[in-house]
Amino acid sequence: MEPSLATGGSETTRLVSARDRSSAGGGLRLKSLFTEPSEPLPEEPKLEGMAFHHCHKDPVPQSGLSPERVQARRQLYAACAVCFIFMAGEVVGGYLAHSLAIMTDAAHLLADIGSMLASLFSLWLSTRPATRTMTFGWHRSETLGALASVVSLWIVTGILLYLAFLRLLHSDYHIEAGAMLLTASIAVCANLLMAFVLHQTGAPHSHGSTGAEYAPLEEGHGYPMSLGNTSVRAAFVHVLGDLLQSFGVLAASILIYFKPQYKVADPISTFLFSICALGSTAPTLRDVLLVLMEGAPRSVEFEPVRDTLLSVPGVRATHDLHLWALTLTYHVASAHLAIDSTADPEAVLAEASSRLYSRFGFSSCTLQVEQYQPEMAQCLRCQEPSQA
């Protein structure tokens, strides 16, 4: 076998057999793999596949929303409308019933509306191309929207906690138990309706919980779920939490309706549900801060990515490895690969990129290939980051 490299990055290996040598009168008869497919060599699909996505996960960006995202947008529109109508009803009902527990439930619905609006906004912005000013596009608008939703919920919840504390100090307040019971019953029905609207039949199954409420990722290696799926699933998780809180408010209203002397259940339930509401925003706030601080994606660890790059044939060392999340569903990686002098830079680049895309689902990878130098082992700038 005599391999030869042709221009254009393709390999044209030809076979030479003893039988061909004798039949040709001492000369060589070259048999091309491209003209005689009866003796093919093993193909390397990974290297060939990289021609279609040389530096991106997707070969060609979509010009509009996919059918899945269109369906997700419809679900979010419907759920947002239902949520807004019943939130307004809870505000009115809570005011008429003088119930802080109802108002707390309405505040939680306000956070849900903000989360769904952020998801809808991100779905719309995902179709806008990057510009020379916004070179990464508008992806982080979703993160900013989630941050605004969390801040607004904290402000409203803080006000309600202050009012509940005043009610515990001074018991000169009256609860309209009938209006409170009616409003709480309607809130339960509203959350059941939103859960039905957002329920995804045949959604991909996943094990474990990501802790991200507005755009969770699948745990482990592999491609993140699409934005449409994650947005609807996050809203569905929100609604399930609201449903449990609405059942709690309903239980408190039933107690006050039949036992008016236990009206203290209203400020007490306000305290409990406010803590639950603030606690439910903790994963979202953590993910938002991680994205804004250019932190590594929670579903991707540093060591496996480094080891994957070092396992590529020809790679001696890697440095300047950076992993960050542009959003919770858009992961980016960049690294320098120090290779042997005998290694083919194009082959190393293609293989390393292919492994990063297939194993970790990065949306964009930037790899710089350079010759290995012994001085790299002592270079302070080439050392790995600390564990913290």
Curated annotation (Swiss-Prot):
Segments traversing the membrane: 76-96, 106-126, 146-166, 178-198, 236-256, 264-284
Chain positions covered by the region annotation Disordered: 1-41
Domain of life: Eukaryota
Reported consequences of knocking out the gene: Homozygous knockout mice lacking Slc30a3 do not display overt phenotype with morphology, body weight, lifespan, fertility, litter size being normal. Zinc ions are eliminated from synaptic vesicles in brain of the knockout mice and the overall levels of zinc in brain is decreased.
Membrane topology: Multi-pass membrane protein
Cytoplasmic compartment segments: 1-75, 127-145, 199-235, 285-388
Annotated positions binding Zn(2+): 108, 112, 238, 242
Topology feature Lumenal, residues: 97-105, 167-177, 257-263
Compartments where located: Cytoplasmic vesicle, Secretory vesicle, Synaptic vesicle membrane; Synapse, Synaptosome; Late endosome membrane; Lysosome membrane
Keywords associated with the record: Antiport, Cytoplasmic vesicle, Endosome, Ion transport, Lysosome, Membrane, Metal-binding, Phosphoprotein, Synapse, Synaptosome, Transmembrane, Transmembrane helix, Transport, Zinc, Zinc transport
Tissue and organ expression note: Expression is restricted to brain (at protein level). In the brain, most abundant in hippocampus and cerebral cortex. The mRNA is also detected in testis, expression being restricted to germ cells and highest in pachytene spermatocytes and round spermatids.
Sites of Phosphoserine modification: 63, 66
Subunit-level organization: Homodimer. Homodimerization is negligible compared to the human protein. It could explain the lower efficiency of zinc transport. Interacts with TMEM163.
Protein family (similarity comment): Belongs to the cation diffusion facilitator (CDF) transporter (TC 2.A.4) family. SLC30A subfamily.
Annotated function: Probable proton-coupled zinc ion antiporter mediating the import of zinc from cytoplasm into synaptic vesicles and participating to cellular zinc ion homeostasis in the brain.
Name of the protein: Probable proton-coupled zinc antiporter SLC30A3
Organism annotation: Mus musculus
